């Protein structure tokens, strides 16, 4: 978790991890800070724009989750761990929330428009079919034309990869392809 400044050689480690959580406004990641960039290139840039949570969640795709504060960050980490096994020998935890796996999702009849040229929100489909309509986005702000998220069906953890018709008509590009590959 990146909750404060992380610069120089220390920033290599997070980039090699499976999941990076970054706190908005306080978490920063960059090889070289704004002062060095200014002295070398003459360009003035602030630390937030250079390596802040918004930059790494929306633009570079280096971070996978953005938290509003340290407490939110820890809570998001706990939530992610609830979807994952403790090690490669274990299965992911099964967590039942009382959602009937045999329920009918009537809203699926109206989510996808009759006109094939109209976009729809794939998140509406995900909410309709997952336990309690709950899911956890992975890289949710990056490459929005591809959805990657964790969810549950009948209490069992699953990963979902889906094109998002509301963003670029769901067309694939290099960024969303990279996002899906990292998720897999």
Identify the role of each PLM range.
Residues 1-89:
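Conserved catalytic cores of soluble enzyme domains
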Residues 25-26, 97-98, 155:
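Short hydrophobic/aromatic-rich motifs at helix boundaries and adjacent loops
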Residues 33-34, 54-61, 100-108, 159-164:
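Short acidic (Asp/Glu) and glycine-rich catalytic loops that position anionic groups and cofactors
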Residues 34-36, 41-45, 50, 55, ...:
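Short capping/connector residues at structural and topological boundaries
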Residues 39-44, 61-68, 111-120, 165-172:
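Short, exposed beta-strand "edge-strand" segments with a Pro/Gly-rich flavor and a Y/T-containing core
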Residues 65-126:
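Terminal amphipathic helices with adjacent charged low-complexity linkers/tails
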Residues 118-184:
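Non-catalytic terminal/interface segments that mediate subunit docking, oligomerization
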